[in-house]
Amino acid sequence: MKNRFNGKVVWVTGASSGIGEALVCNFMKRGSTVIASSNEPAELDRVLKNCVGLPGKMICAPFDLSDTSGIEQIADEQVATTGGIDYLINLGGISQRAAIVDTPLWLDRKIMEINYFGTIALTKAVLPHMIRQKSGHILATSSISGRFGFPLRSAYSASKQAIHGFFETLHLENKKNNIRASVIIPGRVRTKISLRALDAQGREHGKMDAGQEAGITPEKAADQIIRGIIRNNREILVGSGELIMLYIRRYLPWLFFRIADRIRST
């Protein structure tokens, strides 16, 4: 089977751990040049050392999604360095574990700033370059909680639902430019997302949710994402049995609300 990623340039945010790290290694095995971004430079260096010997190339480009002021310059620099971006995979983000009544507005804004505005800022910075090269594929990460509300995740769910609206519009506006847009919808994946989720004081939750612990590995999630890219899927579902909640919410909403009322971990 032809390797469509050999020699391609792939930009991955959230690349210092979890699904992002697994994607970096997967694409490098396929011969891609991977721009790896995160707000943790030391962890990016660790990923780079772990990928030594793979046929692809990794470029470390650390930045913080919560500070959008310099993103356009970073994008211009990476395009100049690599000659162009073929795939942009927005994985960086933050989750939440706090009830609405306990969550201050500044925390809602912070989560939205990282998950939504940070993602679209990088997307808008890369898009003109893709339009000029008349090709590209931009992906953003939502969540199954981006398809429905869920307890203790109000701002997180809202930020992920906003991603769907933006990227559906991105796809419709740029199909004529030969640019695709897709949304990745993860369920339970064994990453640090619940450990790093923010509580009502903006501190790390520090606990691994039982559902997260039982989830698929980041490596399997990366395989599912790449398979979805190859198939040109508009929505790429990542996970296993928990994804049935998407269908229950759509076709049996009464059952969904009964189940969601009892579940506190995803």
Task: Annotate each PLM feature.
Residues 16-17:
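Conserved glycine-rich cofactor-binding loop
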Residues 30-47:
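Conserved glycine-rich Rossmann-like NAD(P)H-binding loop of the short-chain dehydrogenase/reductase
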Residues 91-96:
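Conserved NAD(P)H cofactor-binding loop of Rossmann-fold oxidoreductase domains
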Residues 99-100, 107-109:
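Substrate-binding pocket helix/loop in short-chain dehydrogenase/reductase
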Residues 123, 159:
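Active-site helix of classical SDR
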Residues 143:
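Residue(s) in the substrate-gating loop at a strand-loop-helix junction
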Residues 176-240:
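SDR active-site lid
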